[in-house]
Amino acid sequence: MSQLTHINAAGEAHMVDVSAKAETVREARAEAYVTMRQDTLAMIIDGKHPKGDVFATARIAGIQAAKSTWQLIPLCHPLLLSKVEVTLSVEPVHSRVRIETCCRLCGKTGVEMEALSAASVAALTIYDMCKAVQKDMVIGPVRLLAKSGGKSGDFHAGEVQ
């Protein structure tokens, strides 16, 4: 069974020492969903939201979140990200927005938390911009889709039912 890497022998939380690790290309993808009423979704699609371009704002918020992950999650390392991509798409059949993020770097630690932070904050931004119109939007699921690089190898999530 795998050990928790952020807990030392005394059971105390600590930041992992990555100084001896080799630099490798690492990439992670994550997704999040925001489900809403059809009229709320139409307002976003038609560009009629009073606060402006919801997708552009959510995209920038996601990028900022990835770059700020180390400030939000206590034991994350500050990373020199080489790529942050936030893609938003409409799923009208499910009355929701799908957010997919991709983070990449060449470094000593993975970018899973950065990808998840980007997806989460983009979803929260959509909620924030639309809450005056609809307060019962649902955020989720939020999950890691894939990661590559590093000692633990590759990971690919299964399909969500």
Swiss-Prot record:
Pfam families: MoaC. GO terms for biological process: Mo-molybdopterin cofactor biosynthetic process. One of its GO terms (molecular function) is cyclic pyranopterin monophosphate synthase activity. This is Cyclic pyranopterin monophosphate synthase. Substrate binds at residues 75-77, 113-114. Belongs to the MoaC family. Pathway: Cofactor biosynthesis; molybdopterin biosynthesis. Its EC number is 4.6.1.17. It comes from the Bacteria. Homohexamer; trimer of dimers. The active site is at residue 128. Catalyzes the conversion of (8S)-3',8-cyclo-7,8-dihydroguanosine 5'-triphosphate to cyclic pyranopterin monophosphate (cPMP). InterPro entries: MoaC (IPR023045), MoaC_bact/euk (IPR047594), MoaC_sf (IPR036522), MoCo_biosynth_MoaA/MoaC (IPR050105), Mopterin_CF_biosynth-C_dom (IPR002820). It comes from Edwardsiella ictaluri (strain 93-146).
